[in-house]
From Swiss-Prot:
It comes from Neurospora crassa (strain ATCC 24698 / 74-OR23-1A / CBS 708.71 / DSM 1257 / FGSC 987). It is found in: Nucleus; Chromosome. InterPro entries: H3K9_Histone-Lys_N-MTase, Post-SET_dom, Pre-SET_dom, SET_dom, SET_dom_sf. The lineage of its organism: Eukaryota, Fungi, Dikarya, Ascomycota, Pezizomycotina. Its EC number is 2.1.1.355. GO terms for biological process: methylation. The keyword S-adenosyl-L-methionine applies. Residues 162-297 form the SET domain. This is Histone-lysine N-methyltransferase, H3 lysine-9 specific dim-5. In the pre-SET domain, Cys residues bind 3 zinc ions that are arranged in a triangular cluster; some of these Cys residues contribute to the binding of two zinc ions within the cluster. The record marks 227 as: Interacts with H3R8. S-adenosyl-L-methionine binds at residues 172-174, 215, 217, 251, 254-255.
Length: 331
């Protein structure tokens, strides 16, 4: 497969190359990313002759869909910290909703850290154990802040941290692995896609030939949803991210009942809580070449009882993760 694309690259680099064909080329889409030279994405198939869906498009940021409400500019605000170091402490406005640190890693002075990441030593830049275990939301600084792009509280904003390889598995379609070691607590990448309304998500489910299959690619942005919220953007039905036809490499990550990564809600500008990022962090050390996985249905209950109900089992989707902790069914 890799050899077959060498002339493909060459032809797309010619002045008379077909622009439409180049635009729809997965390899050209990947090569256009600013991070490609340092953190390349590769596609490898050593199992069969399958190719990625030609209708799929690689993107490096989520796309806001039709009728998706966005916060008014007057509600947007960033921190006014005098230095990047200030963005680790309770005085940083971006961290107002983070719980103060209370472990042995806390600042030795009077100020308490609310910062989600370790700030020094071998764990610098990794997600703190407290946050990793609780899966509480992560609040970061952003482009509207006074701090620099090197601020230690802009981990997710700076983007993917490792090269990734999309590969063909023996029995689960495409999967993703990393050619370098990943540390526990390390940010890997975001789950990207088209951000759509709940009504549009339901319409797409209804139009899908296999509704349950569509759910594999739809993720609700419901971390902050609250029908009693005074913020109308949070009181309504949550938006959803559809990664089926436009996404990044994480779209191809498979499910596991014993995963090595987990999704965290990451907030930049607090006015954008309803369209928060879905950030993937390693929850254990991941040796290079290991398939990356996360739990598609983390927190879902009732699967075991449904699996023993003859009226429901025929509609359930079998899990193929093959781990010792496999629940038997995805949903």
């Amino acid at each position: 497969m890799e050899k077959a694309f060498r002339p493909h690259f060459f032809n797309h680099g010619k002045p008379d190359a077909n622009p439409k064909e180049k635009k729809n080329c997965h390899w050209c889409q990947i090569r256009s990313f600013a991070t490609h030279a340092q953190l390349p994405i590769s596609i490898v198939n050593r199992e069969d002759d399958a190719f990625l869906n030609p209708n799929f498009r690689f993107i490096d940021h989520s796309i806001i869909g039709k009728n998706v409400p966005v916060a008014d500019q007057s509600f947007r605000v960033g921190c006014s910290c005098a230095s990047d170091e200030e963005c680790m402490y309770s005085t940083c406005q971006c961290l107002d909703e983070m719980a103060p640190d209370s472990d042995e890693e806390a600042d030795p002075y009077t100020r308490k850290k609310r910062f989600a990441y370790y700030s020094q030593g071998a764990k610098k830049g990794l997600l703190r154990d407290r946050v990793l275990q609780s899966q509480e939301p992560i609040y970061e600084c952003h482009q509207g802040c006074a701090c620099s792009k090197d601020c230690p509280n802009r981990v997710v904003e700076r983007g993917r941290t490792v090269p990734l390889q999309i590969f063909r598995t023996k029995d689960r379609g495409w999967g993703v692995k990393c050619p370098v070691n990943i540390k526990r607590g390390q940010f890997v990448d975001r789950y990207l896609g088209e951000i759509i309304t709940s009504e549009e998500a339901d319409r797409r489910r209804a139009e899908s030939t296999i509704a349950r299959r569509k759910d594999v690619y739809l993720f609700a942005l419901d971390k902050f949803s609250d029908p009693d919220s005074l913020d109308p953007l949070l009181a309504g039905q949550p938006l959803e991210v559809d990664g089926e036809y436009m996404s990044g490499p994480t779209r191809f990550i498979n499910h596991s009942c014993d995963p090595n990564m987990a999704i965290f809600a990451r907030v930049g500008d607090h006015a954008d809580k309803h369209i928060h990022d879905l950030a993937l962090f390693a929850i254990k050390d991941i040796p290079k070449g290991t398939e990356l996985t996360f739990d598609y249905v983390n927190g879902l209950t009732g699967l075991e009882s449904d699996a023993h109900d003859p009226s429901k089992i025929s509609e359930m989707t079998k899990c193929l993760c093959g781990t010792a902790k496999c629940r038997g069914y995805l949903w």
